[in-house]
C-alpha cells in the first residue's frame, strides 16, 4: 500500500483564536516528529488548509490562515484548500491522492470533532485504508466537553473507520 500523511487545518489562527489548543505545544512537537518520520520514509505530506470567511481567524490570505510555522510545508508539498469540515468535499484531495497512487492515508490535525472526524470517515467511505495517529490530533474545550475528553472519545469511535495508533507505534510500522 502506498501511504500519504494528511495534516488538517494546523493553521496559525488556531493558536490565536482566543482558546488554547489542547496540549498545544506538545501537539506541534508530535506533528513535527510525525512529519519528519513520514518524510524520512518517502511518505508524501499533504496539508489541508481551511479557508474561513471574512473576519474569521482562518480568513483566506491573513496571517491566521497560514499553515503554522512550526510545521510549515516544504517546497513541493501539496496544500489542499477547503471551505467545509470535509477535506474531500469540493476539493482536489481525491485527485491528488489518485495521482500519487495513494491507497492508505495517515490522518492528523485539527479539530478532532469536526474536520478530523469528517475527513477520517470520508476517507474510509472513499475506500482508503485509514490510520489515525491518536496523539496527533487536537481541539479546544467546548461548553459541554473538555478537549481531552473529545480526543479520547474520538480515538475510540475512530476505531470503526481507522487503525488508531500512537506516533510511537506508527514509527515502528511506517516503513512496512
Question: Predicted regions: what is each one?
Answer:
Residues 1-10:
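Short coil-to-beta-strand
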Residues 3-4, 32-36, 41, 58-176:
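Active-site-adjacent betaalpha module
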Residues 7, 44-50, 133:
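Short beta-strand segments at enzyme active-site cores
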Residues 13-17:
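Short acidic, Gly/Ser-rich segments with clustered Asp/Glu that frequently serve as metal-coordination loops
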Residues 18, 52-56:
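Glycine-rich, proline-tolerant flexible connector loops at the mouths of alpha/beta enzymes
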Residues 18-24, 108-111:
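Short, glycine-rich nucleotide/cofactor-binding loops
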Residues 20-49:
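A short alpha/beta connector and helix-capping loop motif
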Residues 50-51, 110:
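Short, well-ordered beta-to-alpha junction loops that form the rim of enzyme active sites
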Amino acid at each position: 500500500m502506498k501511504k500519504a500523511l494528511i495534516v488538517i487545518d494546523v493553521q496559525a489562527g488556531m493558536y490565536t483564536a482566543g482558546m488554547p489548543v489542547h496540549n498545544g505545544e506538545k501537539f506541534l512537537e508530535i506533528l513535527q516528529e510525525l512529519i519528519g518520520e513520514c518524510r524520512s520514509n518517502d511518505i508524501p505530506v499533504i496539508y489541508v488548509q481551511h479557508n474561513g470567511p471574512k473576519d474569521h481567524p482562518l480568513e483566506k490570505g491573513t496571517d491566521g490562515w497560514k499553515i503554522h510555522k512550526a510545521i510549515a510545508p516544504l517546497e513541493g508539498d501539496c496544500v489542499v484548500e477547503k471551505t467545509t469540515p470535509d477535506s474531500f468535499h469540493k476539493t482536489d484531495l481525491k485527485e491528488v491522492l489518485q495521482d500519487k497512487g495513494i491507497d492508505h492515508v495517515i490522518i492528523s490535525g485539527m479539530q478532532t470533532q469536526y474536520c478530523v472526524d469528517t475527513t477520517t470517515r470520508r476517507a474510509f467511505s472513499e475506500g482508503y485504508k485509514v490510520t489515525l495517529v491518536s496523539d496527533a490530533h487536537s481541539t479546544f474545550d467546548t461548553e459541554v466537553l473538555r478537549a481531552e475528553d473529545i480526543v479520547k472519545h474520538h480515538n475510540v469511535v475512530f476505531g470503526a473507520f481507522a487503525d488508531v495508533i500512537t506516533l510511537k507505534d506508527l514509527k515502528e510500522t511506517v516503513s512496512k
